[in-house]
Amino acid sequence: METEALLNEKISVQQARQEFANYANNIPEPMMVSVAPPKANPSVSSKTKQQQHFKPGKATKDKATTKCCTIS
């Protein structure tokens, strides 16, 4: 019973991916143009956020790696 449910879930995921691929391929060009600028703005802000958090991120990453090493 559980394996059948998992198979049904996998099928539904594949169907959803196919439906999304069909939808993405059928989007008209003017709609793509109108959707592109809002995507560009968050990417710019995320880049600035990454730059701001990049230097402290190195320190936290080093701490995280030392914690992982001590645990292992």
Curated annotation (Swiss-Prot):
KW Lipoprotein (keyword) present: yes
One cellular component (GO) term of this entry: heterotrimeric G-protein complex
Membrane-related topology note: Peripheral membrane protein
GO biological process, one term: negative regulation of transcription by RNA polymerase II
Subunit structure, interactors included: G proteins are composed of 3 units, alpha, beta and gamma. Binding of the beta-gamma subunit complex (git5-git11) to the alpha subunit (gpa2) facilitates interaction with GPCR git3.
Alphabetized UniProt keyword annotations: Cell membrane, Lipoprotein, Membrane, Methylation, Palmitate, Prenylation, Transducer
Lipidation residue positions, type S-palmitoyl cysteine: 68
Biological function: Gamma subunit of the heterotrimeric guanine nucleotide-binding protein (G protein) involved in glucose-induced cAMP signaling. The beta-gamma subunits (git5-git11) promote binding of the alpha subunit gpa2 to GPCR git3, which senses extracellular glucose, to activate cAMP-PKA signaling and repress sexual development and gluconeogenesis.
Localization, UniProt: Cell membrane
Propeptide residue range(s): 70-72
Reported phenotype of the disruption mutant: Leads to starvation-independent sexual development; the effect is suppressed by cAMP.
Family as reported in the entry's similarity comment: Belongs to the G protein gamma family.
Entry protein name: Guanine nucleotide-binding protein subunit gamma
Source organism of this protein record: Schizosaccharomyces pombe (strain 972 / ATCC 24843) (Fission yeast)
Signal sequence bounds: none
Residue positions of covalent lipid attachment, annotated as S-farnesyl cysteine: 69
Residues carrying Cysteine methyl ester: 69
Annotated segments matching region Disordered: 32-72
